[in-house]
């Protein structure tokens, strides 16, 4: 197999290129090397997510054409103030506040605030077997809720970008931290909706400091 280093710097302002350069230096110091990606380049460029906006737009428009995307005007403080349940990774399960807005309501809200955009998920259980953690099931609507696809400033969400990138780069196995286990069901569902073949997932325990 081949190891791909993908730089997930969707928010270019918060993730300047020097951070990616430092990451490569740290990996080299640890004796970890990759076959393609990062500054090394390779056959599946671009490897920096900040350079892939046009690619993500194509998949975004496909989901939009399916009637699965809608504008959301909720602020983070409003969501946390609501007595909504939380996901296993600590985020608020979106209660669907803006899901049923009419065209007139959307137009009125746009006068005051630019919306972010969410993906409408079904009330469906997604089950998969993780290579390290074993069987895992989550209900998309109850345990996750409609999630962000694109921020109000136009930056695409991680949850969309990684699915598109994995497919275009021919990724067959994903090894990552257990903190992303709960993201996998919604990503698997998105692979299906976009007609893509998902990779196998392996979630490893995190290495944490004593404090």
Model-found features: residue ranges?
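N-terminal Rossmann-like or analogous alpha/beta NTP/dinucleotide-binding catalytic cores
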Residues: 1-87, 178-179, 183-196
């Amino acid at each position: 197999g081949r190891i791909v280093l993908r730089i997930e710097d969707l928010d270019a302002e918060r993730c300047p290129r020097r951070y990616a350069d430092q990451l490569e230096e740290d990996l080299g110091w640890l004796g970890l090397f990759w076959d393609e990606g990062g500054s090394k380049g390779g056959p599946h460029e671009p490897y920096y997510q900040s350079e892939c906006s046009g690619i993500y737009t194509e998949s975004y428009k496909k989901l939009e054409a399916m009637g699965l995307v809608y504008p959301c005007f909720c602020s983070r403080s409003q969501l946390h103030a609501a007595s909504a349940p939380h996901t296993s990774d600590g985020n608020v399960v979106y209660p669907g506040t803006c899901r049923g807005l009419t065209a007139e309501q959307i137009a009125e809200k746009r006068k005051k605030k630019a919306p972010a955009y969410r993906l409408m998920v079904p009330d469906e259980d997604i089950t998969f077997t993780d290579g390290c953690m074993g069987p895992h099931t989550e209900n998309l609507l109850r345990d996750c809720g409609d999630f962000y696809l694109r921020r109000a400033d136009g930056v695409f969400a991680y949850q969309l970008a990684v699915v598109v990138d994995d497919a275009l780069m021919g990724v067959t196995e994903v090894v990552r931290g257990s903190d992303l286990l709960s993201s996998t069901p919604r990503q698997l569902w998105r692979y299906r909706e976009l007609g893509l073949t998902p990779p196998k997932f392996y979630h490893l325990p995190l290495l944490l400091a004593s404090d």
